[in-house]
Amino acid sequence: MRIGLVEFLLILAIASLTIGPQVALFVDRWLRRANRVNARAARRRAEYAAQAAAERDALLKRFRTASTVFGVCILLALVYTLVFRPIDTPPQAYDAPAVRQDTGAAQTALAADDKGTLDLGEYQNVDCIRARDGLVYAAACDGAALKKCSSDLVRTDGGHTAAVLTVDGELTGFAFDGSGDLWLSILTPGGGSLCRAAHDSWGTAVEQVVTQIDGAPLGAVSAVEAAPDGRIYFAVAAAAGAADGLESTLRTELLAHTGTGCVYVYDPAARSVQKVLGGVAGAAGLALSPDGSTLYVSDLANRCVWRVSADAQDLTAGGKNCSSLVSGLPGYPGALAMDPDGTLYIGYRWARSSWLEKNAGSTLLRGIALRAGRNLQEKLFGLPADAPCTEAVDTADGSWQRVVSGRGAGSVTALCPVESRLYLGLAGSEKVRSANL
């Protein structure tokens, strides 16, 4: 039987009238159910999002609280470290010395070429220079073995360099006495010592002579001088420990101004030690007059050079029988050297710091600088290119003879006049520089 178009349309109409409402009802129920499911899912997502937001806010709040607490702790630790932390050398208030006017002395510059310069090879950080029998001796560290905490006494004739002896620690100074024995000031983390090396045993044995004063370890020994009568003078820069070496001790004393530096004399015949001068704020250098009757002591923080009798006992810097040869120096004096004609050469470790002396009467900022550590302290002091590195004064009348400019050479750590030439040791340099006099 064939169904035509009319019959087909009639069948569709009857079917739609019969089952159409049921289909529509089914679709409606399904759509309603789907909407309810979607609504529940949307509510769950909204709840999850709200819960996540609440948890995130709580976490951020806890993090902010922890960050605030951590920041406050760091701030308190920083304040304690820089302001309240106990230190071995608390700063003392003092009166800053006056600033000297220009002396008008003759100007000399360090030799710019290699003429007169002594190349020490791998040796550097010269702490002391002496001349004897046409040879130049220098206390220096081997640049290839700086971490070994040892120093060498080096001898050179200008072309060949040889190590005479090696000591454990920092060889801060040495001097020859009349018999040819060598006297050494040696600094180790445990303290300082005055030692002797007999002229017939150089390179084999170094004898410790003085390691304590009144039962206390010797402080940071900085210089030694041998008098014509055989007595040996040695300086202690400060009473504080010297774990980081002489330069660190001098910087610390410059900031703290404890005034605990002293000068002692050792009598080899009597084997006795006598205090000559105390109350020095950084006894960094010594020199004796040509006849050995007068002792000169550089006072680092007070920017002056004290003059006392070589026979003096237990004097105080600036007190009775202790006068200043020169004062108000343009820098902080360190090494001293005496010419046979009585001219005293003064080497400057650093140029005068206006910041330091502005805060001379206050201990807060200087205490912060002391606690801040070595890196900051090194940035506080320097020797600019236009600052004098060495000056010469006539000890007879106090007149200024010469000013040596360093051209940015750096801190002067050693001086030695030899005839018409002045040899200089500079911090960190592998060469002994010179200037024509």
Where in the sequence are the language-model features?
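A short helix->beta-strand "capping" segment at the edge of beta-propeller domains
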Residues: A93-N125, G158, G398-R407
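Beta-strand-rich domains and repeat architectures in extracellular enzymes and scaffolds
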Residues: D114-K147, A409-T413
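Conserved beta-strand positions in repeat-built beta-propeller and related beta-rich domains
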Residues: G121-E122, V136-A145, L182-G190, I232-D244, ...
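Blade-loop segments of beta-propeller domains
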Residues: D142, K148-S193, V210-I213
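Short, conserved, GDST-rich strand-edge loop motifs in beta-rich repeat architectures
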Residues: G143-A145, F234-T258, R349-P384
